[in-house]
Amino acid sequence: MPELPEVENVRRGLETLAVGKTVSAIDIRWSKIIVNPDEVFTAGLVGQQITAVDRRGKYLLIRFGEQLTVVSHLRMEGKYEVVAKEAPISKHTHVIFEFTDGQQMRYLDTRKFGRMQLIETGQENTVAGLKDLGPEPTPTTFLKADFYQRLQKHHKAIKPLLLDQKVVTGLGNIYVDETLWLSHIHPETPANDLTRAETDRLHDEIIAELELAINHGGTTVNTFLNATGHAGAFQEMLHVYGKKGVPCERCGTPIEKIKVAQRGTHFCPKCQIKRNAK
């Protein structure tokens, strides 16, 4: 599933390629992707101009004029491309936005799990999943004191808590494993067992790692491509994710993979020592 760095790179691509274009028609080829009735979605957007592309967590917010927004969640395999209408159409293309300039914005999804919902701008908190999102992982919105207080309320393992988008938004399996390794924290450590110093370091690593991943185009492990059709490069910088059996960069101990809250989890058993609950 694309995580925050990947979605941010899709956003940047669409901002460059699609903003300013006006919709002339919409071809919906797989209706389940559209939350609204097809006719409502189409009627609302034909004739509208894309004015901005924003992001909240892993959600894209495609702005049309001043009053309408398409909330788009890529889920597992969703991606966008902006191409000439003459370009061959992939069998995995499920929604096509035709523009008045002859180009098209296409939504592709091999798994068909992605979703789009047309709403009035300003009503984002009515969308399931958006209304309960935690802070964006930036120094001004993701505060150390608040993060520490949130973790102190939970005795569950730190990994699934970080995956909960209510604590901090945008993290998924890859970046949770990476930031826990950078912070020397075992993924099964009870959240309320972390000291303030450990929590502060984890906070800083989350912000720094996501920013670094964004600047390297995100991580392409399987099929991720940004809106310009390019893969990310951050997979070359991963420390533990997908590296079972590979020597740890810090200590040489083989990286292990376990299940934590039903999620495959990579860590170093020497650098990330498991602690018991208080």
Curated annotation (Swiss-Prot):
InterPro entries, per the entry: DNA_glyclase/AP_lyase_DNA-bd, DNA_glyclase_Znf_dom_DNA_BS, Formamido-pyr_DNA_Glyclase, FPG_cat, MutM-like_N-ter, Ribosomal_uS13-like_H2TH, Znf_DNA_glyclase/AP_lyase, Znf_FPG/IleRS
Domain of life: Bacteria
Binding-site list for DNA: 92, 111
Names of required cofactors: Zn(2+)
Pfam families xref list: Fapy_DNA_glyco (PF01149), H2TH (PF06831), zf-FPG_IleRS (PF06827)
BP-aspect Gene Ontology terms: base-excision repair
Gene3D superfamilies from the UniProt entry: 1.10.8.50, MutM-like, N-terminal (3.20.190.10)
The species this protein was found in: Latilactobacillus sakei subsp. sakei (strain 23K)
Record note on quaternary structure: Monomer.
Keywords for this protein: DNA damage, DNA repair, DNA-binding, Glycosidase, Hydrolase, Lyase, Metal-binding, Multifunctional enzyme, Zinc, Zinc-finger
Co-factor binding comment: Binds 1 zinc ion per subunit.
Gene Ontology MF terms in the entry: 8-oxo-7,8-dihydroguanine DNA N-glycosylase activity; class I DNA-(apurinic or apyrimidinic site) endonuclease activity; damaged DNA binding; zinc ion binding
Chain's role: Involved in base excision repair of DNA damaged by oxidation or by mutagenic agents. Acts as a DNA glycosylase that recognizes and removes damaged bases. Has a preference for oxidized purines, such as 7,8-dihydro-8-oxoguanine (8-oxoG). Has AP (apurinic/apyrimidinic) lyase activity and introduces nicks in the DNA strand. Cleaves the DNA backbone by beta-delta elimination to generate a single-strand break at the site of the removed base with both 3'- and 5'-phosphates.
Catalysed transformations (reactions): Hydrolysis of DNA containing ring-opened 7-methylguanine residues, releasing 2,6-diamino-4-hydroxy-5-(N-methyl)formamidopyrimidine; 2'-deoxyribonucleotide-(2'-deoxyribose 5'-phosphate)-2'-deoxyribonucleotide-DNA = a 3'-end 2'-deoxyribonucleotide-(2,3-dehydro-2,3-deoxyribose 5'-phosphate)-DNA + a 5'-end 5'-phospho-2'-deoxyribonucleoside-DNA + H(+)
Family: Belongs to the FPG family.
Gene: mutM
Zinc finger (FPG-type): 239-273
Stored PANTHER family: FORMAMIDOPYRIMIDINE-DNA GLYCOSYLASE
HAMAP family named in the record: Fapy_DNA_glycosyl
Active-site residues from the entry: 2-3, 58, 263
Assigned EC number: 3.2.2.23, 4.2.99.18
Stated name of the protein: Formamidopyrimidine-DNA glycosylase
